A protein has these predicted regions:
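Sec-dependent bacterial lipoprotein signal peptides
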Residues: 1-14
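Domain-level marker for long, solvent-exposed, non-transmembrane regions
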Residues: 16-311
């Protein structure tokens, strides 16, 4: 029996003696992952190892929360991180130094949570400005004010999730009604489109595509629920122009009017033109109108957005 006890003790000492306490995994295992976020680094000197560990922590935060990168809140979170352990593994051949950068999750939460609460309160306050019954243009103006806060709230939540051991979101039920509010209010603004003249289908394609990219609802010009009206008249000049340098040249233009259908007011007018030369007359007409369509679509997007923001 004594021999058996002696053998067990001997095996225990051998096991303990074989445990390398200088490994990164062993040193990191001393920290409760529920309470701390720990990142390792190494270098030829203590300072190099410390700097590398802290830099690695900073890079991980920035990589997982790109929208918060470069902001004050990220700097404030990092201000709570410390390099708590620096050591040298004498048994390793490279004799490098190792370091651990440690971020207490509770301290990080103390920075992020108040900002989340404040942003939620601001969003709630703005949401109370929505009209009853709904007024598409007035509601969209409120949504424009909310959108920067929505983006800020989402960035803060990314940071909050990264700090949590379980990667949970902060009060998702509170933020859920606002996440897509801008898209919803934008889609509620119905735009009627009417194009008359040569190559009208070509023009319509560019205009509708631009409005869809903005997220606006597109309807027929005769729809009684339209909020904004886009009216375009296209023309083709020099349709019978002579060949120049072996090409048949054509010049196209469009007169565009943007109207507030609710107020029956034209808030923007402009003209665009373009020219193209090909070996075939029909191709010249089409390509010149495509150029007009691209220009018109770009200006419609810019002018309409400015009006919707300031109306």
């Amino acid at each position: 029996m004594k021999k058996l006890i002696t053998l067990c003790c001997t095996l225990g000492l051998v096991a303990c003696g074989g445990l390398n306490k200088n490994t990164i995994s062993y040193q990191m295992s001393k920290y409760d992952t529920q309470a701390y976020y720990v990142v390792a680094g190494d270098g030829a000197t203590k300072k190099a190892a410390s700097d590398q560990a802290f830099s690695a922590l900073q890079k991980e935060l920035q990589a997982h929360t790109p929208e918060a990168a470069g902001t004050q809140v990220l700097d404030d979170v990092l201000a709570n991180a410390k390099v708590e352990k620096v050591w040298r593994d004498k048994e390793a051949q490279d004799k490098h130094y190792y370091a651990l950068a440690v971020l207490p999750r509770e301290k990080a939460n103390a920075v992020v949570v108040p900002l989340l609460n404040r942003t939620d309160a601001q969003l709630t306050g703005l949401a109370q400005q929505f009209s009853t019954p709904a007024d598409p243009l007035a509601d969209l103006k409120v949504a424009y004010k909310m959108q920067p806060l929505v983006e800020h709230r989402a960035a803060l939540d990314d940071l909050y999730q990264f700090v949590q051991a379980d990667r949970s979101s902060y009060m998702p039920e509170t933020f859920a009604p606002y996440k897509n509010i801008f898209k919803e209010k934008m889609a509620a603004v119905l735009v009627g489109v009417e194009v008359n003249g040569v190559e009208s289908e070509t023009m319509v394609t560019y205009v509708i595509d631009a409005l869809n990219k903005m997220g606006l609802g597109v309807v027929d010009a005769s729809d009684p629920d339209k909020v904004v009206s886009v009216q375009i008249d296209t023309e083709v000049d020099n349709y019978s122009s002579k060949k120049v340098d072996g090409l048949i040249w054509c010049s196209s233009s469009a007169a565009v009017s943007l109207m507030d259908a609710q107020r029956d007011v034209t808030f923007s007018r402009f003209n665009v033109q373009d020219r193209a030369g090909t070996t075939r007359l029909n191709d010249s007409v089409r390509r010149s109108m495509q150029g007009v369509g691209r220009q018109a679509a770009a200006q419609i997007s810019t002018r309409l957005e400015n009006y919707l923001k300031t109306k």
